[in-house]
Amino acid sequence: MASQDCHMLLSFFISTFLITVVTSQTRCRNFKSIISFGDSITDTGNLLGLSSPNDLPESAFPPYGETFFHHPSGRFSDGRLIIDFIAEFLGIPHVPPFYGSKNGNFEKGVNFAVGGATALECSVLEEKGTHCSQSNISLGNQLKSFKESLPYLCGSSSPDCRDMIENAFILIGEIGGNDYNFPLFDRKNIEEVKELVPLVITTISSAISELVDMGARTFLVPGNFPLGCSVAYLTLYETPNKEEYNPLTGCLTWLNDFSVYHNEQLQAELKRLRNLYPHVNIIYGDYYNTLLRLMQEPSKFGLMDRPLPACCGLGGPYNFTFSIKCGSKGVEYCSDPSKYVNWDGIHMTEAAYKWISEGVLTGPYAIPPFNWSCLDSKIKNNESLHTQYSLMNS
């Protein structure tokens, strides 16, 4: 009996060891490209490429892009986005936009994220009483474009692109923010908006499953930002009732509670998918708490002590007006965007995006954490990353 127990115990340890080895091998990958889906938080020029010359988005005009590119690049920020910092971290060129790119080089990545995009189809939102632009490129439409472009992306020799997809870092989102923005900007009741959350989560989950079936092995799926810290919402829902604001950050607590609700539902679904696909890395990016950390301790990260106002905007307590936005004639921007969290009232500055990317890639804001043990030594020995890491962890 004792011998049998020993045999079973030995088998258990061997099995555990093998599982650990397999897990460590699948957890750490040297990514060859980035494939991205999402909205304006990740758009590197798609909305600009899709727009007519007579109806260009604000990201087509200065001062967008001034900090890094020194000209508008189609990004909704003063400089680089989270996806750009991810690419730099992985030693991959900035990911080009798919839409509007003529003879684009997509060997190292392709980006389908479009400003204003929703997770849900417009027809679903319209059924729920929410207005949606018919030009919206939903997550489903982006995924459809990706699948239709596979022969072009990989060539006729590999029409399904399975090898490329398997070795790609796949970024899905943040997505879903606009599904909530549209009704919230119309001042819909928060309980009505909550009804959209299960639909949004299911849509994101379905996209992940489709990509897994196509060979995808590593996903970063970010949650929503704290909506209550958005300058647009702070302006729209401004109230003299101080109890509606967090005393430390000045953010609207009820809107942040909604963001937490979405993020909890998303994490629960990602946990289910991990159990369903144990061979796949599905990592949750905690954008919510990373951004909140910047709001709570701005000076620690080189930001100004009052981080809520927009760098680029006009009017009101938060330097933001819905009718006259950043990029419009006569709207000025701050002298030092690196001291600001908010760029234009809705999107963040390059400085904020850099901290968020570091918090997710090398800090405590990825669930489960990334394993970068097999990365190139130049990346692992990057001193600036270690500095950022220590700050985000302290």
Swiss-Prot record:
Subcellular location(s) per record: Secreted
InterPro entries the UniProt entry points to: GDSL, SGNH_hydro_sf, SGNH_plant_lipase-like
Glycosylation sites recorded in the entry for this protein: 136, 319, 371, 382
The enzyme's E.C. designation: 3.1.1.-
Superkingdom of source: Eukaryota
Family assignment from sequence similarity: Belongs to the 'GDSL' lipolytic enzyme family.
Name the record gives this protein: GDSL esterase/lipase At2g27360
Native species: Arabidopsis thaliana (Mouse-ear cress)
